[in-house]
Amino acid sequence: GNPFFDSLESLLSHAIFAIPGIKGITFGLGFEETLLTGSQNPHIGGIAGGISNGDPVSFQIAVKPTPTVGGHGRHDACFALRVPVVAEAVTAIVLADLSMTPA
């Protein structure tokens, strides 16, 4: 990806946030990385400066809690179980799209 506006992180984040119920995304160690010193090896999640560095891309997503099912209407007991499959598919689409984009 383009390391400024169309970085790999921003394109993945944009696509992941399109999934209903997603509230956050972090790459690599996420906010735990702020606790490391400069000499420690950070786990950056396979992305450096917005471009894939060849390591596996890893991220964590936060999903909002399931709404109460006490009311009337249609409810999912837990839609969070479907999120990993959808997130994997969305990630594959973003990576495939980037692989077809001319450099």
Indicate residue ranges for each PLM-predicted region:
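Glycine-rich anion/phosphate-binding loop at the beta-strand->alpha-helix junction
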Residues: 1-71
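Internal helix-turn-beta structural module
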Residues: 57-103
